[in-house]
Amino acid sequence: MRVKVRGFASFREVMGREVQIELSDGSRMRDLLEALCSNHDGLREALFRPRGELREEVTLLWKGHGTDPSESMEIVLEDGDEVAILPPFSGG
């Protein structure tokens, strides 16, 4: 199956604006992020803490909607899904 991933701000600098990733059927969000990390230097450190947990300041959008950080890594992806990776928001 093929999943489209869009990177924003600092993630765009590391992985580019948009990439297509081929995954096995039944793959989860964690599998997608691991595949991305293996292809883009510096992405693992930006996404994950040293013990492998997704950094809480990273926002994942799946099918245009925010994901629950406690459950996002176990989302089962489908062919044609779109995932966006956003860095922390700031402003005043």
Q: What residues fall within each predicted segment?
A:
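Ubiquitin-like/PB1-type beta-grasp interaction modules and other compact soluble beta-rich domains
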Residues: 1-91
